[in-house]
Structures are given as C-alpha cells and as structure tokens.
C-alpha cells in the first residue's frame, strides 16, 4: 500500500511541476514559441526569469505582442493575468518592448483596458495582459508586492540560418584539423 501512495505522490508532484512549466506552444503567425509560466513573480523579476529559460536553443524573453492575432493567441495560453515585455520605466509614457528582437521599439499595437495606461499613483511602469486579452499598466515602483505569472517568447534560429551556421562550424573545424595535421 505504501508504494501506491508514494507513486501517487510522485505523480502529483510531476503534475504540479508540469503545469507550472508547460512545453512552449508554436504560433504560426510569428513563427515563435510561447510559454505561460504561472510562477508568481514581481514585474522586474519576470524579465530575468524569462531570460533564464531556453527552448530549441533560443533564449526566452518576455513576450512582445505585435498584432491582434498574437494577442488572442497569448490570451488563450494564460489562466491568470501575466506580465508581458512592455514598459515605460525608461521614459514615462513611452511604452517600449524591453526584450527580444523588438527591444527598444515603441509599441505600435496595443490593447489597453479602458482608461489605461493611467500610471496610477505615479508608479505603474510594466504591463500585464489579462485573461480577457486587455492590458493594464501595473507593477513597480508603486506596487512592490504585486506578483503573478509571465509569458515567455522564444524566437528560434530559422532553419536556413541554422544550416549556414552548421556549415561554417564544420568548415572551421576542417580548417583547424587540416592545420593541426600539417604541423605533425
């Protein structure tokens, strides 16, 4: 009987871990992969946590949402409000992407909730996407204890570039080997 209880406990633990760290999902609209991480973190911690993840050789970053289709896709991934990579911490009122290929770019597409962004109490510099797909400015510096999950985006190296990098690496290896053989 105790072996059955141990097995059930192990399976329950695996289930909890798997739900918090799901396999990233591919979105054909961007060619990227996305992952909702339900770990409860501060807005400023979410960026570092996303960068600590990788998938298919690509380093993660907080999701950048460039159109309504991508917004809908991400909305369907999340089960609670989640941090995305949009911030005006650098320049108040200038909402720009903090990571990924769009880092530093001003947001051209937004889906703010009515009355947002409002910089409530002069301190909402980060963006959460809600389960209805609308966005809210929130987080640090004013709300120092506001925590929730985040959406990680992965931009894998395109296949042709991967093959080119492999070819360059093989050529370099061949050159070094040839140079080494001629010395001996």
Per-range role (PLM):
Residues 1-8:
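Bacterial N-terminal signal peptides that target proteins for export
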Residues 6, 70, 162:
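Residue-level recognition of oxygen-bearing side chains
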Residues 13-14:
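Short, linear, compositionally biased motifs with a strong N-terminal bias
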Residues 21-156:
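Extracellular, disulfide-bonded carbohydrate-recognition/adhesion ectodomains
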Residues 158-177:
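A short, hydrophobic C-terminal helix/tail in secreted or cell-surface proteins
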Residues 180-184:
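Short, charged juxtamembrane terminal tails flanking transmembrane helices
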């Amino acid at each position: 009987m105790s072996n059955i209880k141990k097995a059930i406990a192990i399976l329950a633990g695996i289930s909890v871990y798997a739900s918090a760290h799901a396999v990233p999902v591919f979105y054909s609209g961007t060619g990227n992969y996305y992952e909702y991480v339900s770990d409860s973190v501060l807005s400023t911690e979410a960026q570092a946590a996303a960068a600590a993840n990788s998938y298919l050789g690509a380093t993660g970053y907080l999701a950048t949402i460039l159109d309504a289709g991508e917004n809908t896709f991400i909305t369907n991934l999340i089960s609670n409000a989640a941090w995305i990579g949009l911030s005006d911490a650098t320049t108040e009122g200038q909402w720009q992407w903090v990571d990924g290929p769009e880092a530093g770019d001003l947001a051209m597409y937004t889906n703010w909730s009515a009355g947002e962004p409002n910089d409530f109490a002069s301190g909402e510099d980060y963006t959460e996407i809600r389960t209805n797909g609308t966005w809210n400015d929130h987080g640090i510096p004013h709300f120092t204890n506001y925590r929730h999950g985040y959406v990680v985006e992965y931009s894998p190296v395109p296949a042709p570039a991967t093959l080119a990098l492999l070819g360059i690496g093989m050529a370099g290896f061949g050159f070094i080997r040839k140079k080494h053989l001629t010395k001996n």
